């Protein structure tokens, strides 16, 4: 197998790895979007009821009542908390969802482009394999 053919097989492998990484990134983006949407839904719910479920860990919750549901405390860094109005946080989270949706679109476009390269490269490799087979068949001695 010549060096160019080896390089094409390696490129095909790299493209497949890139697609896998991009799909993993898409999955992470989807999880972030879902978490933000759940948070928005919970904050919207505070407008009609002060009762919340407070997570204790390992799937355990306790019912509690929000003392000041108009204010949300956000973690904005290591040991840094910021208090904001609930409506402002909802707007911020909605903007984050929009940005993540744009990022998701870019990642999907990159996956599509990479898949096109994979198809193109596979086609070239199939043509080369067919040509090698044909040459190999022509070189075999004929038996009578």
Curated annotation (Swiss-Prot):
GO CC list: cytoplasm; prefoldin complex
Coiled-coil ranges from the UniProt annotation: none
GO molecular function: unfolded protein binding
Residue intervals passing through the bilayer: none
Annotated InterPro entries: PFD_alpha_archaea, Prefoldin, Prefoldin_subunit_alpha
GO aspect biological process, one term: protein folding
Cellular compartment(s): Cytoplasm
Pfam families with a match to the protein in the record: Prefoldin
UniProt keyword annotations, A-Z: Chaperone, Cytoplasm
Family: Belongs to the prefoldin subunit alpha family.
NCBIfam families, alphabetized: prefoldin subunit alpha
Physiological role: Molecular chaperone capable of stabilizing a range of proteins. Seems to fulfill an ATP-independent, HSP70-like function in archaeal de novo protein folding.
Subunit architecture: Heterohexamer of two alpha and four beta subunits.
Name of this chain's protein: Prefoldin subunit alpha
Organism lineage: Archaea, Methanobacteriati, Methanobacteriota, Methanomada group, Methanococci
Gene name, Swiss-Prot/TrEMBL: pfdA
